[in-house]
Amino acid sequence: MEVRRGDTCPRPHPSGLREEGLEPKVAFPGGANRCWNLGADAGSRLTDVFGSVMLTGSASFYDCYTSQSEDNVDLRQTYTPFSSTEYSSSVDSSLFCAPWSTYGDDIKQPSNSQISIKNRIQTERNDYGSETDLYGLVSNILEEQDKSQPYFAEGTCSSNLKSVWPMNTSRFADHHDLLTETKRPIDTVISQQAFYSDESVSAMEKQYLRNSNLTPQQKIDELHHGFTGLDLEEQWMYPSRSDHSNCHNIQTNDTAKTTFQEYPLIKNCFTPQTGLSDIMKESGVDIYHYGRDRICTKGLEAPLQQKRAEMFLSQFNRYNENVDYCRYPEYVHPNKAKLNKCSNFSVQDSKKLANGTPETPTVEADTYTKLFQVKPANQKKMEETIPDQQNFTFPKTTPHLTEKQFAKEAVFTADFGLTSEYGLKPHTACPANDFANVTEKQQFAKPDPPHSEYFKSVNLLSNSATSSGGINLNRPTWMNVQTKNNTPIPYRNQGNLMKLNSHLSAASKGSNHSSDFPQLSSTNLTPNSNLFQKYCQENPSAFSSFDFSYSGAERIQSVNHIEGLTKPGEENLFKLVTDKKIKQPNGFCDNYSAQKYGIIENVNKHNFQAKPQSGHYDPEEGPKHLDGLSQNTYQDLLESQGHSNSHRTRGGDNSRVNRTQVSCFSNNYMMGDLRHNQCFQQLGSNGFPLRSTHPFGHSVVPLLDSYDLLSYDDLSHLYPYFNMMYGDNSFSGLMPTFGFQRPIKTRSGPASELHIRLEECCEQWRALEKERKKTELALAKNYPGKKVSSTNNTPVPRLTSNPSRVDRLIVDELRELARVVTLLGKMERLRSSLLHASISTALDRHLESIHIVQSRRKDEIVNASNRQRQGVPRCQDDRDVFALASAIKEMCVATRKTRTALWCALQMTLPKTASTADVVKPLQDTVNCEDKVHESINSSNPMNQRGETNKH
């Protein structure tokens, strides 16, 4: 083997090591010019020098080292030539390892002495561990991971941390959303074949069966060809049947029937409708075609009708946003699908209002929007609702409109009988006298898709009551508030009804987002209890978290007798409900709906709506109760505010939320005692009565994440008194339930990113601390009698009087890195050989990343002080915060690599004869003990750092 001169380190004769029996068996000079320090006893002085022979091949992976007292180890001298206040982004090229093939051509026949040295190296490897098996891992410590790996030790990120940066931005192929359309995988496009029509899907399936080796470009062409025949403005969910029964046939009261539609899962999604044209042809109405598969009635007002329909759809779609739940997984974004502008409605004959006034004739032949259906005076119009809509639900004061004003705005009345964009069945209303026939037909109807029976029962229950005159504005059901009712019986029953409705709606959602709960203060139908009972039996988990105060038989029985039956012969149906004698504790009847954003919907008796006992709406009665509405609404908001304040932690970071509790409640029967909160006691002492404890405890609606909260601008225009409560100050988020207290302080984009990076790096630091302790325990177990400790006297900067989380993290990282360096020095002494060069390089880069974070933190403080000195309000610059977050991210990566290097060093140091079971058991006990201590510390103070509690 060729011997090179002039590129070696001095070779001292370690007399001190000979005395202690720790003389190295062989010297490992390497190709690096800088030496890595090895600790020895304080009293030993090294005078000899290792040989200047450089070994090629496997020996070229090792650096030369100089022994030094371990008590005087200085990080600044050990890892970087710069001072502690300076750093360099460049890395010495000598730190990198030479590959195996570098000197492959220069190898010559080695001498006998060199052969003996090589044999001793191999013997030492066999005696002292699995070093040969770790070469692949150790040499790749400094390389980036091929796949995006989370920096959290447990592998999962907290649910309230959402980063705007991908885990590994160097590999965009792993992030399909960052690629262009042409570079994305083909599989993500093939799954969209469910959007084709019958003919397209079948043809494509046959083609792929014949030839499964299509190229990606051919697949793209096939998909593009299929999409060219689509009209993107059309409805994406058409009925699967083309007969008359799948159309919305609005008929007279005597022949009203409930019809339900079946919607396909994959196919038949673009089959054109034929029921509308058939019905219109049979009715004798002149029609004409426009667009693609669209029809309209001929007449003078045909263009006007089309315009009205489009305006109505725009109004209707305003309340169909923020939807992230769909029954069919094929439709990733169901809220993008527009409603069917050609909904199948038959022409309604001229009707008369309850007071004898003819209905406005301008919308008689409107085939796009069916405005309302008139009932006799003793019945109520049942408005069709969509239970899966998720709207912002805060009551808006209903203006008092006369019949003339209503006739002008009638075209904008929301008809919720339109085809739902979720693939659910429409909700069809029917009068009480035909309900028995409808129920009988439903039981013998054609089987529907899964859970269809449940949706039938929901259809019959989730219909809100309005006046028989048809007075209804274009507002969702959460805007319908009630008027004062002079009869106490319906309000005693309303608690049961609202509770049941909230359960049904929450169960139908299947997620944390609850839907709109229509107020059923007065109905004229009886639900099909068999269907509801059957669903409860088949899906017991949906109702497992709810608690009723009476048995299941009485539950179904009470549901069957909903209040508001106006026929004299049906008054006896109230007995089973009124016998329950469910009354409010303080005279109020405030039903709380578990809304998506946790906002309270007050429907107490002081609110106003069409009177449920009389079929006539008196527009002059509303102002009589307006004062009571405002006063009692704000009182309930005050009381609910105290409940939400109890879910804020009392120490550390004020933005951390306790997610094990809830802040919303479905209604007043599921509310807990709010007086346990100190803030609520302060609010209650201002003259507002406190509610007593309710028997059902807290609600099951979980607390939403902070990024799901509604903005101030979205709320201010929905409620007229909101600006009076909160003033003109804007803010970026709302608490789940709000009152007069100002909302919480939220983070901006850079601050949020900094918070996420801090959490990641702190997690890596804790993991490094655990692994270092496990390493010490393993070494002490396998080398009894040896001094294996990471204790050192390396100077570490002290914290300031008011340190931030970044300052604490910097000090903790420096302290832990010094301990790891000391422990690695002990490992080299135990194994009598140097460790791999990548291990020392990983430690060098870790220290360098810490110095960079120190510099970024210093720049942030200096820039903030300069802005304050110039008279600018003290605020953080986004650039400084982003730079600090980027530096912390790099330090997190370096910490993870140090963990890998420590583990590799331990595996190379442990003797081969060590029993794995003897090592694993004490390590596991140590980890479990440390986890318990860490959990107890976090439970007392979430933001308390482990570095402050440990005794160093």
Swiss-Prot record:
Residues 936-952 have a biased composition (Polar residues). GO terms for biological process: chromosome organization involved in meiotic cell cycle; double-strand break repair; female meiosis I; germline cell cycle switching, mitotic to meiotic cell cycle; male meiosis I; metaphase chromosome alignment; mRNA stabilization; oocyte development. Keywords: Cytoplasm, Meiosis, Nucleus. Its main location: cytoplasm. One of its GO terms (cellular component) is nucleus. Coiled coil: none annotated. Pfam families: MEIOC. It is found in: Cytoplasm; Nucleus. Expressed in fetal ovaries. Expressed in testis. The keyword Transmembrane helix does not apply. Residues 1-23, 609-629, 933-952 are annotated as: Disordered. Residues 617-627 have a biased composition (Basic and acidic residues). The keyword ATP-binding does not apply. PANTHER family: MEIOSIS-SPECIFIC COILED-COIL DOMAIN-CONTAINING PROTEIN MEIOC, PROTEIN CBG18333. Interacts with YTHDC2; binds transcript that regulate the mitotic cell cycle inhibiting progression into metaphase, thereby allowing meiotic prophase to proceed normally. Interacts with RBM46. Is required for meiosis completion in both male and female germ cells. Confers stability to numerous meiotic mRNAs in gonads allowing proper initiation and progression into meiosis prophase I. The function may involve YTHDC2 and is independent of induction by retinoic acid (RA). Maintains an extended meiotic prophase I by properly promoting the transition from a mitotic to a meiotic cell cycle program by binding transcripts through its interaction with YTHDC2 that regulate the mitotic cell cycle. This is Meiosis-specific coiled-coil domain-containing protein MEIOC. It comes from Homo sapiens (Human).
